[in-house]
Design a protein with these regions (language model features):
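NTP-dependent small-molecule kinase module
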Residues: 19, 23, 134-164
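ATP-dependent small-molecule kinase phosphotransfer cores
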Residues: 31-77, 81-88, 112-113, 127
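Short, well-ordered beta-strand core segments
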Residues: 69, 93-94, 143-145
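A glycine- and Lys/Arg-enriched "phosphate-lid" helix/loop adjacent to the NTP-binding pocket
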Residues: 90-134
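Hydrophobic anchor at the beta1->P-loop junction of P-loop NTPases
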Residues: 5
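Short glycine-rich anion-binding loops that position phosphate/pyrophosphate groups of nucleotides
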Residues: 75-77, 99-101, 150
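Walker A/P-loop
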Residues: 14
């Protein structure tokens, strides 16, 4: 069984994933890192040179390679029905959430997020992305955790309690 960490960029999926693997006998997989390694270029370069559709194809392929892993998924992975179905059939999906203003503060200096690159009003853009993805996140998630005012340890422990 896999544990899929889903949610918007900046919710802490990679950080929480690494903490979870210290508590569980699972490997940790950051899908974005695996995609970059496979493609030989950054996510931003993939978006710029090959387009979002090609990135989403790589993402869907990488999702299927792992078992008994904690997988930090890219924020948009839930936009494809095939990915939502695969996660439901092969593990538990944990949705990490935070308000657009909290995410904007966390991501203010980030240049590695192609959907935010060069954008002025990141908070408004994040809110629009959330509204577009919200139902897919909620329908995919087996459990949801609001991360805005919790420590990494509190979030990790809440997930572990839910998995027991």
């Amino acid at each position: 069984m896999n544990i899929y960490l889903i949610g918007m960029m900046g919710t802490g999926k990679s950080t929480i994933g690494e903490l979870l693997t210290k508590e569980l006998e699972y490997s940790f997989v950051d899908l974005d890192e695996k995609i970059e390694k496979c493609a030989g270029k950054s996510i931003t370069e993939i978006f710029e040179n090959d387009g979002e559709e090609n990135f989403r194809n790589l993402e869907s392929e990488q999702l299927r390679f792992y078992s008994n892993s904690v997988i930090a998924c890219g924020g948009g992975i839930i936009m494809r029905e095939e990915n939502r179905t695969f996660m439901k059939e092969n593990g538990k999906a944990i949705l990490l959430t935070a308000s657009p203003s909290k995410l904007s503060k966390r991501l203010i200096q980030s240049d590695s997020r192609p959907l935010l690159s060069g954008k002025k009003n990141k908070e408004k853009l994040l809110k629009n992305i959330w509204l577009k993805r919200r139902l897919h996140y909620l329908n995919t998630a087996d459990y949801t955790i609001e991360t805005g005012h919790k420590t990494h340890e509190e979030i990790t422990n809440e997930i572990l309690r839910h998995l027991d």
